[in-house]
Each structure stands twice: as C-alpha cells, then as structure tokens.
Amino acid sequence: MPWIQIKIITSKQHDNLLETLLLETGAVSVTFQDAGDQPIFEPLPGELKFWDDIEIAGLYEADNNLHEHQTKIAAAINKIKAMCEPGQHFIYKIEHLEDKQWEREWMIHFHPMRFGQRLWVCPSMQAVPDPSAVNVILDPGLAFGTGTHPTTALCLEWLDSLDLQNKILIDFGCGSGILAIAALKLGAKQAIGIDIDPQAIEASRDNAQRNGVSEHLVLYLSGQEPKNLQADVVVANILAAPLCELAGVIADLVKPDGYLGLSGILNTQSDKVSQAYQHAFCLYPIAEKEEWCRITAVKNKNDGI
C-alpha cells in the first residue's frame, strides 16, 4: 500500500497541537525529529528536553480515501497556519511514498561488523564473514544496541580485549542484550542484564535465544535484581547523567579487583564521570571514538564512594 506523508517544520510550542491535528485527520503515525542541528544531551531525572525547531511527520494511508485524506490534510494545514504568530516560521510539504517493509529496508544497509580481534556482529540475513570467529547474530529491533553506534562499538571492543572465561558479567542498561550476549560468546559463564525498559528485557531474551546462550543469561527489570548482586565485570552503556547519579549503585555491582566499563559518554563529559568513580576504582586511559568515549577501571579492594 502506498502512503502520503506530510512534513511540517515549525516551533516546538506547537508539538502537541500538531500531533493531535494530524491524528484527527487520519494519520496512522506521527514522528518528531530535529529540524536543524541542535544537540540535545541527556535530561536530568524528571526533565524533558526538546528541540527548539521540530520536524513533524504524519503518515497517511493512500487508499481509496485519498481525496478525503488530502482534504483533511489541507484543512489541518490551514488550522496550523492560523495558529502561527507573526515571526514564527511554518514550512510544510506533502510526499507520496512507495510501500516498503521498512525494517527489512534498514537491514539491507546493516552489514557484518568486526570489533577487536575475535568478535563480529552479523545480521541474520547476511552470510557470516568468518565462521571461526566469535559471531553475534543480531538484527535491528525495538531496543538500543546493534554495534553501529560508537558507544556500543567501544564496549564491544573492550569486551573482546578481556579474558572472560568463567567470569560473571552484568550489563547495566542492557538494551538489545548485545553486550551480555557478546560476553557469553567470548567465554563468560553467566551474564546478567538489567534495564528499566520491558521491551529491552524482551529483546535481550529473544536475541539470547537466537544466539544459543539464553540458558546463561539472567534478566531483571531495574529494581528487581537481588540485593548484594556482584560480578567480575560490569559494563554500563547508558548516558553520563545516570552514570554519575547511579555511581554508588553501579560501583557496588563490581567485585573487588573486578572490571568496570562505562560508555554513552561524550568526550566533554569524561572528567565528570571519571570523578564519580575515581574513589572506588583505579581508572585506565580513556578510549575515544568520534565524539564519544569509554571509561574503564578496576575496582579497589577497599572501595568507597
């Protein structure tokens, strides 16, 4: 089925009203993205950040009711124009889109990737480049983590560099489960994934089953993990603000002499995150990839944050 897409560029104060108007005129989905190039870093707990200028896209079915949809869209545009105050900009365009299986379309451009010396992440639809390597089979899905982002790549390269034989690893903020699964395939005897998102737990479980390691992966929604839980290796690829806020919680998960890997950190945020952990850990040199970095450390025998 072909589709009609209306894209609107305007100020952020119209976001809720525009979303309502698009849905009321028959849009089957409404998405938001940055209309310019404004970086938005992670919000503090309870804070909601949004771009100043937004692009809102409404997607409509181009079926037998095409004329009706176009009439409704035109009416919506007129309403939106009337809302704009003098000096506020409003740009829109209407596009006709061919029908595609969008997830499959994205997967066409997702190729096998190598991390370190042993580890590959490969989509299920493509041949594994090196069958003798450590291969994680992973497709794009609902939860974060396929290896394409620099922070995930930094964590995978670090895991590949470790001797994980018979080790227990905690993946704090597990997303797709890619780091926990990679650790198991690299020799860890058990991996524990923790996340605040039920979709991440589901995605991690499905991906572990696909990779044949589900028996060795334990998953918890955040807050439901056992007390006094500890592991030989802890990796947390989240964001700088929660890494700082939860420094005590994350540090307690690492056994004395255990290893910690942190990412989701911009290069400009590395000092702040390092300071949150330096009292309990001996920090290694920071690794960088593009504008992102990874902090690694070993826990002191007598720690305290």
UniProtKB/Swiss-Prot annotation:
Question: What domain of life is recorded for the organism?
Answer: Bacteria
In Pfam terms, one family for this protein is: PrmA
* CDD domains documented for this protein: AdoMet_MTases (cd02440)
Q: Record's family? A: Belongs to the methyltransferase superfamily. PrmA family.
GO molecular function annotation:
protein-lysine N-methyltransferase activity
Q: What is this protein called?
A: Ribosomal protein L11 methyltransferase
Q: Which HAMAP family match?
A: Methyltr_PrmA (MF_00735)
Parts of the chain that traverse the membrane: none
Cellular localization per UniProt: Cytoplasm
**For this UniProt entry, what's an example GO CC term?**
cytosol
The organism is: Hamiltonella defensa subsp. Acyrthosiphon pisum (strain 5AT)
Q: Which UniProt keywords apply?
A: Cytoplasm, Methyltransferase, S-adenosyl-L-methionine, Transferase
Reported EC number(s) for this entry are: 2.1.1.-
Q: Does the entry feature the keyword Cytoplasm, yes or no?
A: yes
- Gene Ontology annotations of biological process type: methylation
Q: Which reaction does it catalyse?
A: L-lysyl-[protein] + 3 S-adenosyl-L-methionine = N(6),N(6),N(6)-trimethyl-L-lysyl-[protein] + 3 S-adenosyl-L-homocysteine + 3 H(+)
